[in-house]
Amino acid sequence: MKTYAVLLALVVAFVCIAESTGYPVEDLEDDELTELEAEALLEDLLEDLELEDLDYNEEARSWKSMAKKLKEYMEKLKQRAG
C-alpha cells in the first residue's frame, strides 16, 4: 500500500510540474507524435525511471529520501526531453 502511495505522489508531482511548466498548445500541434512514437517514448521513460527498484527500508520512506529520488527522476526526464 505504501508503494502505491509513493507512486501516486510521484505521478501527482509530475503532473503538477508539467502543468506549471507546460508549453502552449499551438507549439505542440506542429510536433504531434504518432501513437506508436508516444508509446515508445513512455516505455523508454519508464525504463529510465526504474520505479520498481525503490528501496523499502526506513530511509526510503522518509520524505527527504523521496524528495531526493523525485529530483533524480526529474533530472532524468529533463535530460530525456531536451
Swiss-Prot record:
<comment type="function">
    <text>It has antimicrobial activity against Gram-positive bacteria (A.globiformis VKM Ac-1112 (MIC=0.3 uM), and B.subtilis VKM B-501 (MIC=1.2 uM)), Gram-negative bacteria (E.coli DH5-alpha (MIC=2.5 uM), E.coli MH1 (MIC=6.0 uM), and P.aeruginosa PAO1 (MIC&gt;40 uM)), and yeasts (P.pastoris GS115 (MIC=20 uM), and S.cerevisiae Y190 (MIC=20 uM)). Causes paralysis, but is not lethal when injected into insect (M.domestica) larvae. A second study reports antibacterial activity against E.coli (MIC=100 uM) and S.aureus (MIC=84 uM).</text>
</comment>
<feature type="modified residue" description="Alanine amide">
    <location>
        <position position="81"/>
    </location>
</feature>
<feature type="short sequence motif" description="Processing quadruplet motif">
    <location>
        <begin position="58"/>
        <end position="61"/>
    </location>
</feature>
<dbReference type="GO" id="GO:0042742">
    <property type="term" value="P:defense response to bacterium"/>
</dbReference>
<keyword id="KW-1053">Target membrane</keyword>
<feature type="propeptide">
    <location>
        <begin position="23"/>
        <end position="61"/>
    </location>
</feature>
<dbReference type="GO" id="GO:0016020">
    <property type="term" value="C:membrane"/>
</dbReference>
<keyword id="KW-0964">Secreted</keyword>
<dbReference type="GO" id="GO:0050832">
    <property type="term" value="P:defense response to fungus"/>
</dbReference>
<dbReference type="GO" id="GO:0090729">
    <property type="term" value="F:toxin activity"/>
</dbReference>
<keyword id="KW-0027">Amidation</keyword>
<dbReference type="InterPro" id="IPR018802">
    <property type="entry name" value="Latarcin_precursor"/>
</dbReference>
<comment type="similarity">
    <text>Belongs to the cationic peptide 03 (latarcin) family. 03 subfamily.</text>
</comment>
<keyword id="KW-0472">Membrane</keyword>
<dbReference type="GO" id="GO:0031640">
    <property type="term" value="P:killing of cells of another organism"/>
</dbReference>
<feature type="signal peptide">
    <location>
        <begin position="1"/>
        <end position="22"/>
    </location>
</feature>
<dbReference type="Pfam" id="PF10279">
    <property type="entry name" value="Latarcin"/>
</dbReference>
<keyword id="KW-0800">Toxin</keyword>
<keyword id="KW-1052">Target cell membrane</keyword>
<dbReference type="GO" id="GO:0005576">
    <property type="term" value="C:extracellular region"/>
</dbReference>
<protein>
    <recommendedName>
        <fullName>M-zodatoxin-Lt3a</fullName>
    </recommendedName>
</protein>
<dbReference type="GO" id="GO:0044218">
    <property type="term" value="C:other organism cell membrane"/>
</dbReference>
<keyword id="KW-0295">Fungicide</keyword>
<keyword id="KW-0044">Antibiotic</keyword>
<keyword id="KW-0732">Signal</keyword>
<keyword id="KW-0929">Antimicrobial</keyword>
